[in-house]
Amino acid sequence: MPPAGAAPLSYGIENDIQHPVYARHGMVSTVDETATGVGLDILRAGGNAVDAAVAVGYALAVTHPQAGNLGGGGFMLVRTRQGETVAIDFREMAPAGATRDMFIGPDGNADSKRSLTGPLASGTPGTVAGMSLALDRFGTLPLARVMQPAIKLAREGFSVDKALADDLASYGREALINHPNSKAVFFKADGQPYAEGERLSQPQLAHSLTLIAEQGPQAFYQGAIADEIAAEMQRDGGLIGKADLAAYRAVARQPVSGSYRGYQVFSMPPPSSGGIHIIQILNILENFDLAHMGAGSADAIQVMAEAMKFAYADRSEYLGDPDFVKVPVQALTSKAYAKTLAQRIDVNRANPSVTIKPGQLQPYESDQTTHYSVVDGQGNAVAVTYTLNTYFGSGIMAGDSGILLNNEMDDFSAKPGVPNMYGLVGGDANAVQAGKRPLSSMSPTIVVKDGKTWLVTGSPGGSRIITTVLQMLVNTIDFQMNVAEASAAPRFHQQWTPDELRVEKGFSPDTLKLLGERGQHIKVLPVMGSTQSIMVMPDGTFTGASDPRTIDDLTAGY
């Protein structure tokens, strides 16, 4: 197979969405300009990519509270200069008091209000444990040093950007307004949310961050912060207790990996479904000449959409927390299995979802997670996707800690066979169980070429994370786009149920008409995903791009 074309070193036009940012020594790509600056400062000060990634994670908890967090969880993928790749799972866990039917209402149906908005919605947070595990194993700077910028931002405040102002005015009014502690932080005395350009300080969060910096993660899991979280839960009828917090552990796992046209792809293993299904879909696509079909062509979209259907059907049946259920990783990611699925794809006629597996109900979908990527000049690379689940999580702030808590329990299958808020159907493998981690679509991904890191990428977007990351890989490898072109190209999504091909604006009307004639049910939707990506060039320099769909994000290097 011919290797993918390398992105040009620099066009010298950094504000053009078709041209990447260029740097020689290190690069950071995040959803927030301030957090990107924090990461770069750590790199310039001699820290490595993991040091910078941990600093960014804590900074985003201050400046991007929609998804950046201490009270949530996520996944980190680390590739070291020595060529070791490790997946760090800091996904939230169901508290000990959680039961399989806890979100089933009196009518026998799943009650999404309880799994999204109430005190029962929160799982035991993992972010603080995950960041410390990464830093202890791969970092070079002390925790107090990498947390210093976040503490300063929380204590002294920062200028609210348009993205945060808009989200406070919309989602914040829903999620935060009914919780006095949260309202006191994000809304002013006159009842209005902080607006663009106004200064937002969070002294309580600064205090919590300082405790973690001084005492380590035990401050969060066994100390004063644990007391605040447990008391808040007890007050409101939540389940997280001090024993749940003390028992939480982040886990280093073997990443899922596969090959695609000569490239090695590493991504998250279960409890993320992302890595398995990205590799499964790539394995199917390897049976087709996408480059010949062409980017944005009806043939390429048809083949990719059909491959997506098969993967999402399998997701509903087989995926869950590997500590509780046996996930058939090898079978799902085998080339032989993919070939049998590829043989069922007709470029001229779509397979109705009902012929693959029964689908049901209409989903709701939004970009409510955040992803960032970091590389350094020594050959280390980090991809992180973490979240509170929906914007601002449950909206509940733990006492006087300044920490927003997640509503991640909605990612379990409250009633197997019935979609969650992202329209994703789950089976018994993802049923609620004490101590279990809910299934996720988060897919921090690193692509390796000739033994060296080539692409670091990921995205928010609920169920669309998998297909967004997939299209970044296909755009760069098959269609030979540079990292900025690949980020800007219009996206599409098919998740098996409902049986519709969701497309962004930007595709040719003739192409969409052709796809409709081939049996695809087209639905034009707003933008999908928010990739933050970095590509490493053959000479070791970097090109990067933040998604043009997102305001106030920034990729920068030095």
Identify the meaning behind each predicted range.
Residues 288-388, 400-401, 408, 416-417, ...:
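Internal maturation/activation junctions in enzymes
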